[in-house]
């Protein structure tokens, strides 16, 4: 394997056996690709904004004399960049400008004669833009649009599985679901009549739809039935025979022909009889007259002499009717062929319950059902029916819908119109009747071929279209109002409805969610989440078990493990590692093609629909060198079932063992040894890990860590290769390699790092460089680590030395005992940043003022404020401290004469304002790390605001001039090269000042041209610099766009350092979670023979019942990794020669059977080997991929190499007594996470506080500063103890006896410790409640 310079710093030993055929794809592509499709110009007009515009435009006036046409659109540049938007609290968006053309036609002239054309660019609101990491910044906060899994448009055949009717009869139904428009349902009732519903309203007989489509009874019967033809000859009744139809019937008369009896009366007709009839080519048989009675006529029969209707289609024949028909000369009678087995008389029966008899009555019936209570007119009824399914504006199946529709009806072509045709409706009815007749199967709604993904781009497009349609109405009105000569396109378009629709979607849609930003993994998972909830989806309450369940088609598309616990289980899923969506929005997963029994490296992506036709082998099937299967029988999946197939039957093979799971689950080592429920918890808890102060890569990983860290966007990644030219804490400069430069550029890349900013979850985002000066880097190398990343690998927690043993009950029931050393070394110390805002508004009584002059506040409380009344940076503050002093004018109150006198003497100020300062919330303490002041345009800036501005300007100038210097240096080095090549002596040149170099002339014309080009570039560079500086200055000094009535906003950022303490929640990666019960002194912890104490003691009883054995294997392997690290460390300390180190490290990497990774240290320089050894001294990181991990024997080998016992257990001694514990204990290294459930955020106590309005009881919860509820069970406890007085005070004065508690307060003040309990307020509420039910209830005083 070839490693880049940065990757050589620390190589993970990989235990994977299967070769990696396909690299892990870019993990955020589902978001970025979808949005790209939305905003990029699509010449076909299939997707995105283009499609939305084309579907609404051209807009014609009602008269048709003018129309507004769409030409093209363009997106402008965003005003602020992403960081500025976050700081200012605005949306990161770009203006949308659309070129429209107004065409006015001549009124009197022939059609299409143009009178006037006006073209203009019109502003149509702002479109939020996606950041590079797949998020949106809306009002300053990062949000994610979650993809939705909804039912694909198309036609679905389903049954109620016998649940609707008490008889248990299975009722079948068909539903046509368009992308937008009305749903059309067909369903059978228990009497086998076929009904139709439109938009789930009242049901009507299904034949009404056919009548509305202008079919007569005769045509309807002709469509749905086969015919039986009877002929009257010589007063005998003969029937045309189709032998196949007789199968399974019982003969009601002798079947004879040509004097031969084929079936005797009363006998069952079998296949043998049918073969004989076919062999003798029997076409007609004689039947008795009784046989025809009860048959149904297929068409109308009219007496031609009188013109009178003898019998209408769908009438039952009787002997009288037969005689009439015979008399009027009808010798050939067509009847419907029906039987109970596979040709039911459903449509014929339905026609009998159908009240309508022609098109008009059918249309009226539909109109009455859709618009009850409105008087139907012919026109209204016709237009309503037309608009339901046959109008492009109101109805659209979409390309997906048409494809699914045609596939379901087994048609050849998959493209077609977006509206329904007559044939579509009839074919659906025919297929439904076939299914009722026992031919064909119902669809499985939970099959991923019937559910598709709607991503950001598509949802935004739909919202945008909604806005356009609102505008369309207004435009039509304007076009009709006349005076078109002076009208311009922009006078007609109001951008408000469009931007409102888009804003509503991004701001408040159920699928637009506040990004989960705890750590890089939670970001990635959130962006790859797939929800079945949301508009047009399911609701929690109505979703049954089937929808939530794992389906065979989830394999490789949706993760079977990662889903929330609780009411949303199974409704919110995570995309599998390799899954992607196809053009129709269905999930597909990659497979390796198998041709002629050889597994090739050709990759095909298959959707769930296509996959059903193939036999697919698992990724862990063994192959030989050429790619043949080793075993004769291979475990494969086919049509959702798993079984053994011979190797020639295999069509495809899985790409990777981790294809099944999502990113979160693929980070759990030894996942294959964990119970699914615990794996689910493990995958979910990794997302709650708080980034620690110093990230520590996991010793035991899965090899996915690098992909997650790089794709999440929290690290700085090199865009192009080069050499590190400058590096400090906040920026990295790279001189780009010659071959990667664009022609005519300076060849310098500058990466500015993010420093100590707040995430959505109040954790700290900070980037630290991990390259040093002069290092070569390649494209894609990690230059700086972000939160929870270590040398470009995801690092959510810390490697802790754990022992599985009981310790004095401190690890009872999943409690965790932690050593004090963990606290001392700050292993789990985290930084949290809180943003506190103070808003100064304009009130009716005057503006609020931000000032240090606050009434009735002592000098001490103001000690941390500057003269503007704002806290200074670096101040350490605790709960209740003032951060921003603010006073609010208060209303004039009636003054007493004394007060008037005092005011006259001392002046006004003190009494007419009240203190409304921003204070630190209770229980919070920390350091002020940043202050920002936003001032409204036109409001005078205070001193602090000007200082901050000055500082920002200085910083911006410094940044830009440094940037300029770097670029200049790059440019001048190229100028120097040209001059030297052109014959100028290098020494003389260096003595000349750089600015004068460009004045030199060269004799070589080509070199002179190059020099002139470089001179032009230099001028451009300086010009660009001035432009940038001016733009920055404008941005910094301009006023801010604040909400109405807001004059100033001051934001204060507090950094809080949280050490680990009892009550904090910790977890491993296998769902093994617990709460810290005690921080134990180091000297009391169990220690091994070398005197090394353990860091954490876990309860061994937490393992067997939970069945997550992965944690034990991880512990053993972690021990081995650490053992090898210790040996390398010892060698480094003894300063042994490089060759020995190289040999030992090579041995460690080569260990294990047939490992896919081949590390060849002979290609490394000595310096590189030393650097690698330096990075391995804390332990050799190991990857054990999911379902392809290290085997037990390999772990033992590795333990042996690290000179450790292969049992993984060692003797421990009690730290307090020094005695040995009686049996060896499992000790090793486990990766532990600190979860974002910190005791500091949960601890809370109340002395006095607010009460609920109605019940007058104290509120509950920390946010409301509430009390602890003394509930029903607690009352029982006091009752059981007979503690009557305690109980009385609990239920009265301490809760909601209003008078009692006031009196009590008064008594305590007076020093009289007595209470007088009265009536609790909640009792009065109960009385009122009973009275509201109409029952009078009164308290009688005796």
From Swiss-Prot:
What residues bear N6-acetyllysine in this entry? 1022, 1200
Which CDD domains does the record cross-reference, listed alphabetically?
Answer: RNA_pol_B_RPB2
Q: Which GO terms describe its cellular component?
A: DNA-directed RNA polymerase complex
SUPFAM superfamilies assigned: beta and beta-prime subunits of DNA dependent RNA-polymerase
Q: What is its EC number?
A: 2.7.7.6
Share an example GO biological-process annotation for this protein: DNA-templated transcription
Q: Which UniProt keywords apply?
A: Acetylation, DNA-directed RNA polymerase, Nucleotidyltransferase, Transcription, Transferase
GO MF term set: DNA binding; DNA-directed RNA polymerase activity; ribonucleoside binding
Q: Which reaction does it catalyse?
A: RNA(n) + a ribonucleoside 5'-triphosphate = RNA(n+1) + diphosphate
Q: Which Pfam families is this protein grouped with?
A: RNA_pol_Rpb2_1, RNA_pol_Rpb2_2, RNA_pol_Rpb2_3, RNA_pol_Rpb2_45, RNA_pol_Rpb2_6, RNA_pol_Rpb2_7
What InterPro entries does the record tag this protein with? DNA-dir_RNA_pol_bsu_ext_1_sf, DNA-dir_RNA_pol_bsu_external_1, DNA-dir_RNA_pol_su2, DNA-dir_RNAP_su2_dom, DNA-dir_RNAP_su2_hyb_sf, RNA_pol_bsu_bac, RNA_pol_bsu_CS, RNA_pol_bsu_protrusion
Known partners and oligomeric status = The RNAP catalytic core consists of 2 alpha, 1 beta, 1 beta' and 1 omega subunit. When a sigma factor is associated with the core the holoenzyme is formed, which can initiate transcription.
Q: Per the similarity annotation, which family is this?
A: Belongs to the RNA polymerase beta chain family.
What does this protein's UniProt record list under function?
Answer: DNA-dependent RNA polymerase catalyzes the transcription of DNA into RNA using the four ribonucleoside triphosphates as substrates.
| UniProt-recorded name of the protein | DNA-directed RNA polymerase subunit beta
Q: Which organism is it from?
A: Escherichia coli O81 (strain ED1a)
């Amino acid at each position: 394997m070839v490693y880049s310079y940065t990757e050589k710093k620390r190589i993970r030993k990989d235990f994977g056996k299967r070769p990696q055929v396909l690299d892990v794809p870019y993990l955020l592509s589902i978001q970025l690709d979808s949005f790209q499709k939305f905003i990029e110009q699509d010449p076909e007009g299939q997707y995105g904004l283009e499609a939305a515009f084309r579907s609404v435009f051209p807009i014609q006036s009602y008269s048709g004399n003018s129309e507004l046409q769409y030409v093209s659109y363009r997106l402008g540049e965003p005003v602020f960049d992403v960081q500025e938007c976050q700081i200012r609290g605005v949306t990161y968006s770009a203006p949308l400008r659309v070129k429209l053309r107004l065409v006015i036609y001549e009124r009197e002239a022939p059609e299409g004669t143009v009178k006037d054309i006006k073209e203009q660019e019109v502003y149509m609101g702002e479109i939020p833009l996606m950041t590079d990491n797949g998020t949106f910044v809306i009002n300053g906060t990062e949000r994610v649009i979650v993809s939705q899994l909804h039912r694909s448009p198309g036609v679905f055949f389903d049954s109620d599985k016998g649940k609707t009717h008490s008889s248990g009869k299975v009722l079948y139904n068909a539903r046509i679901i368009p992308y937008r428009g009305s749903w059309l349902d067909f369903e059978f009732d228990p009497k086998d009549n076929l009904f139709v519903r439109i938009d789930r309203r009242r049901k009507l007989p299904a034949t009404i739809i056919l009548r509305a489509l202008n079919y007569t009874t005769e045509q309807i019967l002709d469509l749905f039935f086969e015919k039986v033809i009877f002929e009257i000859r010589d007063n005998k009744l003969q029937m045309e025979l189709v032998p196949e139809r007789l199968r399974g019937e019982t003969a009601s008369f002798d079947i004879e022909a040509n004097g031969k009896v084929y079936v005797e009366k009363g006998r069952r007709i079998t296949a043998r009889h049918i073969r004989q009839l076919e062999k003798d080519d029997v076409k007609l048989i004689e039947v008795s007259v009784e046989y025809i009675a009860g048959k149904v006529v297929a068409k109308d029969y009219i007496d031609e002499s009188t013109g009178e209707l003898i019998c209408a289609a769908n009438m039952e024949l009787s002997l009288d009717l037969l005689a009439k028909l015979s008399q009027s000369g009808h010798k050939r009678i067509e009847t419907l062929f029906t039987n109970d087995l596979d040709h039911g008389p459903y449509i014929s029966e339905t026609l009998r319950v159908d009240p309508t008899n022609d098109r008009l009555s059918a249309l009226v019936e539909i109109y009455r059902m859709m618009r009850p209570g409105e008087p139907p007119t012919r026109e209204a009824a016709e237009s309503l029916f037309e608009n339901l399914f046959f109008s492009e504006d109101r109805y659209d199946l979409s390309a997906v819908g048409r494809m699914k529709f045609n596939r379901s009806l087994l048609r050849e072509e998959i493209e077609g119109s977006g509206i329904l045709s007559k044939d579509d409706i009839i074919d659906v009815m025919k297929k439904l009747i076939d299914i009722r007749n026992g031919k064909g199967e119902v669809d499985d709604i939970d099959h991923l071929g019937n559910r598709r993904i709607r991503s950001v781009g598509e949802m935004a497009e739909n919202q945008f279209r909604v806005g356009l349609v609102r505008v369309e109405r207004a435009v039509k009105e304007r076009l009709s109002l006349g005076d078109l000569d002076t009208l311009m396109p922009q006078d007609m378009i109001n951008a408000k409805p469009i931007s409102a629709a888009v804003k509503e979607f991004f701001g408040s849609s159920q699928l637009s969610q506040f990004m989960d930003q705890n750590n890089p993994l939670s970001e990635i998972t959130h962006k790859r989440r797939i929800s079945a909830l949301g508009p047009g989806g399911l609701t929690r309450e109505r979703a049954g078990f089937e929808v939530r369940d794992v389906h065979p088609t989830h394999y490789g598309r949706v993760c079977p493990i990662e889903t929330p616990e609780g009411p949303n289980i199974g409704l919110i899923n995570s995309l599998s590692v390799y899954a992607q969506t196809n053009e129709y929005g269905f999930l597909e997963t990659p497979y390796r093609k198998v041709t002629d029994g050889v597994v090739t490296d050709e990759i095909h992506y298959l959707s769930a629909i296509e996959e059903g036709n193939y036999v697919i082998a698992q990724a862990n099937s063994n192959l030989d060198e050429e790619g043949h299967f080793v075993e004769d029988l291979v475990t494969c999946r086919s049509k959702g079932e798993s079984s053994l197939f011979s190797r020639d039957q295999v069509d495809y093979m899985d790409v990777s063992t981790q294809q099944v799971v999502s990113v979160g689950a693929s980070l759990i080592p030894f996942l294959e040894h964990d119970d699914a429920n615990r794996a689910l918890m493990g995958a979910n808890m990794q997302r709650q890990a708080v980034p620690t102060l110093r990230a520590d890569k996991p010793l035991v990983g899965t090899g996915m860590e690098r992909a997650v860290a790089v794709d999440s966007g929290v690290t700085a990644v090199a865009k192009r290769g080069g050499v590190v030219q400058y590096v400090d804490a906040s920026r990295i400069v790279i001189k780009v390699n010659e071959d990667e430069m664009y022609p005519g550029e300076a060849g310098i890349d500058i990466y500015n790092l993010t420093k100590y900013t707040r995430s959505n979850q109040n954790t700290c985002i900070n980037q630290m460089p991990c390259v040093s000066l002069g290092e070569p880097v390649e494209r894609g190398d990690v230059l700086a680590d972000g939160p929870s990343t270590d040398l470009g690998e995801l690092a959510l927690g810390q490697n802790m030395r754990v022992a599985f043993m009981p310790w004095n009950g401190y690890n009872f029931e999943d409690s965790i005992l932690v050593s004090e050393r963990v606290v001392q070394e700050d292993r789990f110390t985290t930084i949290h940043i809180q943003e506190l805002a103070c808003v100064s508004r304009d009130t009716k009584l005057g503006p609020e003022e931000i000032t240090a002059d606050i009434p009735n506040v002592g000098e001490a409380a103001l000690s941390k404020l500057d003269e503007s009344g704002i806290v200074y940076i670096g101040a350490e503050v605790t709960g209740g401290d003032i951060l921003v002093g603010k006073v609010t004018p208060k209303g004039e109150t009636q003054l007493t004469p004394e007060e008037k006198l005092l005011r006259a003497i001392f002046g006004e100020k003190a009494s007419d304002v009240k203190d409304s300062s921003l204070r630190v919330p209770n229980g919070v303490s920390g350091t002020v790390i940043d202050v920002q002041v936003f001032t409204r345009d036109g409001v005078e800036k205070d001193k602090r605001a000007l200082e901050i501005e000055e500082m920002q300007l200085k910083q911006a100038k410094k940044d830009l001039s440094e940037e300029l210097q770097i670029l200049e240096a790059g440019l001048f080095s190229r100028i120097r090269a040209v001059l030297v090549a052109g014959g100028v002596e290098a020494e003389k040149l260096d003595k000349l000042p750089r600015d004068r170099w460009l004045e030199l002339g060269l004799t070589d014309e080509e070199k002179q041209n190059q020099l002139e080009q470089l001179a032009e570039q230099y001028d451009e560079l300086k010009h660009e610099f001035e432009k940038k500086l001016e733009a920055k200055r404008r941005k910094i000094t301009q006023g801010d766009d604040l909400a109405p009535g807001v004059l100033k906003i001051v934001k204060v950022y507090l950094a809080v350092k949280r050490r680990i303490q009892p009550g904090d929640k910790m977890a491993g990666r296998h769902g093994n979670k617990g709460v810290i019960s005690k921080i134990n002194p180091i000297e009391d912890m169990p220690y091994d023979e070398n005197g090394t104490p353990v860091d954490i003691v876990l309860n061994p009883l937490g393992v067997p019942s939970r069945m997550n054995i992965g944690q034990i294997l991880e512990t053993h392997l972690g021990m081995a990794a650490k053992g090898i690290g210790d040996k390398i460390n010892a060698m480094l300390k003894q300063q042994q020669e490089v060759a020995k180190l190289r040999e030992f490290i090579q041995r460690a990497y080569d260990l294990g059977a047939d490992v896919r990774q081949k590390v060849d240290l002979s290609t490394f320089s000595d310096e590189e080997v030393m650097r690698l050894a330096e990075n391995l001294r804390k332990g050799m990181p190991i990857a054990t991929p999911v379902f392809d991990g290290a085997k037990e024997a390999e772990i033992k080998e590795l333990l042996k190499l690290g000179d450790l016992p292969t049992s993984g257990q060692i003797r421990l001694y009690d730290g307090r007594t020094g005695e040995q514990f009686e049996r060896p204990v499992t000790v090793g290294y486990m990766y532990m996470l600190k979860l974002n459930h910190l005791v500091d955020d949960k601890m809370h106590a109340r002395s006095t506080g607010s009460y609920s309005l109605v019940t007058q009881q104290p509120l509950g919860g920390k946010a409301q500063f509430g009390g602890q509820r003394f509930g029903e069970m607690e009352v029982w406890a006091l009752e059981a103890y007979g503690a009557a007085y305690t109980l009385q005070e609990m239920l009265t004065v301490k809760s909601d006896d209003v008078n009692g508690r006031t009196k009590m307060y008064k008594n305590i003040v007076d020093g009289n410790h007595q209470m007088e309990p009265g009536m609790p307020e909640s009792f009065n509420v109960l009385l009122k409640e009973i009275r509201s039910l109409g029952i009078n209830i009164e308290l009688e005083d005796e």
